[in-house]
Swiss-Prot record:
Name of the featured protein: NADH-ubiquinone oxidoreductase chain 2
Top-rank EC class of the record's enzyme: translocase
Family statement: Belongs to the complex I subunit 2 family.
Record's catalysed reaction(s): a ubiquinone + NADH + 5 H(+)(in) = a ubiquinol + NAD(+) + 4 H(+)(out)
InterPro entries referenced in this protein's UniProt entry, alphabetically: Complex_I_Subunit_2, NADH_DH_su2_C, NADH_UbQ_OxRdtase_chain2, ND/Mrp_TM
Domain of life where this protein originates: Eukaryota
E.C. number: 7.1.1.2
Compartments where located: Mitochondrion inner membrane
Main function: Core subunit of the mitochondrial membrane respiratory chain NADH dehydrogenase (Complex I) that is believed to belong to the minimal assembly required for catalysis. Complex I functions in the transfer of electrons from NADH to the respiratory chain. The immediate electron acceptor for the enzyme is believed to be ubiquinone.
Amino acid sequence: MYNNSMKLLFLSSLMMGTYLSISSTPWLGTWMGLEINLLSIIPMLTDNKNSMINEPAIKYFIIQSMASTMLLISILIIQMKYMMWWDNKNIPSMMIMSSMMMKMGAAPFHFWLPEVMSSTSWINCLMLMTWQKIAPMMTMSYCIKMSSFLFVVIMMGIIVGAMGGLNQTSLRQILAYSSISHLGWMISSMTISENTWEFYFLIYSTLNVIIIFMFKTMNLFFLNQIYSASYFKTEIKFMMMTSLLSLGGLPPMLGFLPKWIVMQSLIDNKMTALVLLMITFTTITLYYYMRISFSAIIMLHNENSWLTSIKMNKLVVALPILSMISTMGLICTSNFMLLLSS
């Protein structure tokens, strides 16, 4: 573990790499930003005291290196295309999108994400699910266009996210599969407009911050810990439930609003079949969130020793505020309907 000054250095370098990647005009500058970002997060995933914790950092480095190599090959093909007057524009764009999906952990390049997240801390999980997706998604948005390839990618993301989380007991892996499902929605929103996916990503990141703050503060890592947490008052469990259901997209909570905008936009663009399939499999994702939430409230057990280290003072102050943010969809949805009708 590094001291605060080293953490600040790596975090600053991480942010600089992301900003360089999304603001660069040439492809080489984008690649350089992604590499700075990678080299900055690797030390944050490692721990000098425990060599077993370094395993996710090694896995992450290997996958990101493969994706960077694919991006470099794509850039080379683009340069050769201009030199050789090559007319096939789909191959380099598909390679760039594939490399960015590998970096984000989107299906069908998702296999590393649940494994890495299950072995790292909650803060690192939050970074992998939010900040580390910004540069690849911005890069992917430069060359995205709805096609059969993209249709398959969107559906695979939503199906894998729905089915993969059903039999999981680790909260970190459940959030990883939820992230894969949300990536399917965000990729579909990229085909509509830049503002749509950015709004979706903002809401998604906000809800992830809320949920991970709860899990980190309450020292929760597995489902059985939630079920046996009779130490928590029913009000605290209810606030946790509202945040989880909001992330799942239950109407009329905040997490449903970006999904509604994406669905409405896709229907306007004559993609009704895609919307129906997305809704069907997202319902499965919502099911295991509801299963967690209602089981946590209904099931009561004796107090466990691991609960004594929880700092309840933080929860008493923060959870009502965070729960209120999760239910802001009630206000936002009504305002959105007024905008649609005007």
